[in-house]
Design a protein with these regions (language model features):
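Hydrophobic N-terminal alpha-helices or hydrophobic patches in metabolic proteins across all domains
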Residues: 1-318
Length: 318
């Protein structure tokens, strides 16, 4: 292999994505210095200013749409200007992808929560989960803590890994950043909470559109793997829930089917109980110790896909 060919493969979309995956996994980036921390603060501040609960629902929907448009412009427009005007556009694009693949916050919080739960410290376990989810975690039982932790890990596989990688390969760094920003805003403005019931509808709608293909491909692979495992639970028709993203619910169902773990079921947000379809399997608290290993397996799967892409480029190079 010549030096020119090595550089061509290394700086290809698959090579850069592989480097970004490894960098995000092994090099720590403090949460307070990450751009998404600023994004969440800006989104929360903006919603506090323009989302007034005493206004009609139509005005709240319009305010939510304008807030979404503003946040996307504030994030994507400067990134596009820097990316287009930089002499080292590959490096800038790689940094944008690295930002979009941020998973350390959820991974560390769930890991510490699982550690505390294994030692019987339920309050500490609940506190760590509260930092990374809009759900009410104060009254969670051991089963609820375990199920929430696994669901957060599964959600991060879709939103923090596969969706940015897929959009990176299809549309470049700005597409990867855009789809990840939507996932972040969906967490800041969850329609499951009454105050964002109408304000967050535009974000939830665009999230469903952009995450349809990533959820479909991941769910298809997970269900295919589940077919070759013994004693997998039966897949029941998915029941739509207006207060929880159907796209995400479909992925959680497939994840539950693949790993034979109980997920879904009712949750609580801002004091309101929200019913969700339950997906059968073994109790989550019995399989919680394997959750980190499952996440690593999916990481290896993504790395394998990128290596296959690199090998394909090598075989079919001009």
């Amino acid at each position: 292999m010549t030096v020119e060919l090595f550089k061509e493969l290394l700086f290809s979309p698959f090579g850069l994505a592989l480097l970004a995956l490894l960098a995000e996994r092994w090099f720590p980036w403090p949460e307070q210095w990450h751009p998404f921390a600023v994004l969440r603060l800006m989104a929360a501040y903006m919603s506090g200013k323009v989302n007034k609960p005493d206004r009609p629902s139509s005005q709240q929907k319009i305010a939510g749409f304008l807030a979404l448009l503003t946040m996307l412009l504030l994030v994507l427009l400067p990134a596009a200007i820097v990316f287009a005007g930089a002499e080292v556009s590959l490096a800038i694009g790689w940094l944008i992808l690295l930002v979009s693949l941020r998973q350390q916050t959820v991974r560390q919080a769930t890991h510490l929560s699982e550690q505390h739960l294994s030692k019987g410290r339920k309050n500490a376990a609940r506190a760590w989960l509260t930092r990374v989810t809009w759900r009410d975690c104060d009254l969670l039982s051991e089963h609820g803590i375990a199920k929430t932790s696994i669901e957060l890990r599964a959600t991060s596989i879709l939103e923090s890994r596969f969706a940015p990688l897929l959009f990176w390969c299809l549309g470049g760094p700005l597409a990867a950043l855009g789809v990840r920003v939507l996932a972040e805003l969906k967490e800041v403005w969850p329609t499951a909470q009454a105050r964002y019931r109408h304000f967050g509808q535009a974000t939830a709608w665009l999230y469903a559109i952009t995450h349809f293909l990533p959820s479909f491909f991941l769910s298809l692979f997970a269900r295919t793997v589940g077919l070759f495992r013994r004693n997998t639970p039966k897949i029941e028709p998915l029941k739509r829930n207006p207060l929880f993203p159907t796209i995400l619910l479909s992925w959680l169902q497939s994840f539950s089917y693949c790993h034979k773990v109980t997920l879904g079921g009712p949750i609580q947000a801002a004091g309101i109980r929200i019913s969700r379809q339950r997906f059968g399997g073994r109790p989550a608290e019995l399989l919680l110790s394997q959750a980190a290993r499952w996440q690593r397996i999916w990481q290896v799967f993504f790395i394998t896909c990128l290596l296959i892409g690199l090998f394909t480029l090598f075989i079919y190079r001009p």
